[in-house]
């Protein structure tokens, strides 16, 4: 992780295996955020062809760089996606994506895991649970994810709802119930 993209220039013409691991969501208390997902694929590259590598930031120290949603009040984030892009720097140039894990909401349940194909949903028994993003739609929740971005978590009535991780489509952010009970 560097906080910026890195450039890879193919040294020879041939088939390359690409791998990416999404970042872990932010932790609080005794529980960790969801683990990041894993993706792999192969691509044919000509000598000198350029790929842009984005390594997602974890949800605590690196603020969910590359799409992790924010959990206000706790200042933690969902994990950022890790991806590889070809032909440019935009989200539409991504050719391989591994989703970041969701942040913890409460201190008693882990966040949802990041996906390769589909991310995991939040864990808990109160409020609105965030669902994982997929290749075709963002995760839903109290605040839904969007293209490339996890939904924000919620801090209300002294309760926390976890933030979604980044991905092709980001995971949804969780909410809290009316009494402020934590959701994950």
Predicted regions and their residues:
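C-terminal subregion of chymotrypsin/trypsin-like serine protease catalytic domains
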Residues: 172-184
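Extended extracellular/luminal ectodomain segments enriched in beta-structured repeat modules
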Residues: 10-17, 46-50
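Non-catalytic, beta-strand-enriched accessory regions in extracellular/secretory proteins
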Residues: 1-8
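Secretome/extracellular-domain signature
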Residues: 33-131
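Calcium-regulated, polybasic anionic-phospholipid
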Residues: 15-30
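Extracellular trypsin-like serine protease catalytic domains
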Residues: 133-162, 166-174
